[in-house]
Amino acid sequence: MSPTTTSLRSLSFSLYASSNSTPISTPIEARQLLSSCNRFYGLSSSSSSSSLTTSSLIGNLVFSSRNQSLSVKVQALAAETEQPKWWERKAGPNMIDITSAEQFLNALKDAGDRLVIVDFYGTWCGSCRAMFPKLCKTAKEHPNILFLKVNFDENKSLCKSLNVKVLPYFHFYRGADGQVESFSCSLAKFQKLREAIERHNVGSISNISSSASEKVEDSSE
């Protein structure tokens, strides 16, 4: 037999064997590749699997922690949004928000001889915000006095016509006397507002009792 014939038969047998052999499955190849990598890096399959599991757990914990933190922030923001803004809070029925010049004039007219205190404020005004809780307390102590709140930004034409140039600013009105006093005030000078109330709310029973309580409060401060 010639070498050429032997070579052709060997090639034919090799091709036949190749076409009829069962291919190695992909999972087996993957496992073999992973095993080779582990041997190269000196790791066992179990330690590699353990490392992957630990990494997954840590990743899940971090993701869960971030989700919880985000959830808390969202809940806090929602609670803050639901609460009224500081300027939206009212001390009682004797504190009214003014939204127009017409409403302002009608409120003064309907008050009769009742003392009316107008608070001109801005939502952005830090001094207005600082003294507002004390103003609300004063309104509760004087239910006979009508307090009107005027938002400067929403009633600019009204404020301009009344010559309001600084905030917070107060106007005092009483019956036929009209405007009896006006001044700027702050938390540090809140006593100025109390003294004006004593001057213009003369004869009121609630004024006498509240003045006594204010003196006690001042002596304790």
UniProtKB/Swiss-Prot annotation:
Stretches assigned to the Thioredoxin domain: 74-202
Domain of life: Eukaryota
Gene Ontology molecular function: oxidoreductase activity, acting on a sulfur group of donors, disulfide as acceptor
Positions of the catalytic residues: C125 (nucleophile), C128 (nucleophile)
SS bond list: C125-C128
Subcellular compartments: Plastid, Chloroplast stroma
Classification via PROSITE patterns: THIOREDOXIN_1, THIOREDOXIN_2
Gene Ontology CC: one annotated term: chloroplast
Biological processes annotated in GO: detection of redox state; regulation of photosynthesis
Transit peptide per record: 1-73
Main location: plastid
Pfam families given in the database record: Thioredoxin
Keyword terms of this UniProt record: Chloroplast, Disulfide bond, Electron transport, Plastid, Redox-active center, Transit peptide, Transport
InterPro entries named among the record's database cross-references: Thioredoxin-like_sf (IPR036249), Thioredoxin_CS (IPR017937), Thioredoxin_domain (IPR013766)
Protein's job: Thiol-disulfide oxidoreductase that may participate in various redox reactions. Possesses insulin disulfide bonds reducing activity.
Family named by the database record: Belongs to the thioredoxin family.
PANTHER family: THIOREDOXIN, MITOCHONDRIAL, THIOREDOXIN-LIKE 2-1, CHLOROPLASTIC
The protein's name: Thioredoxin-like 2-1, chloroplastic
Source organism of the structure: Arabidopsis thaliana
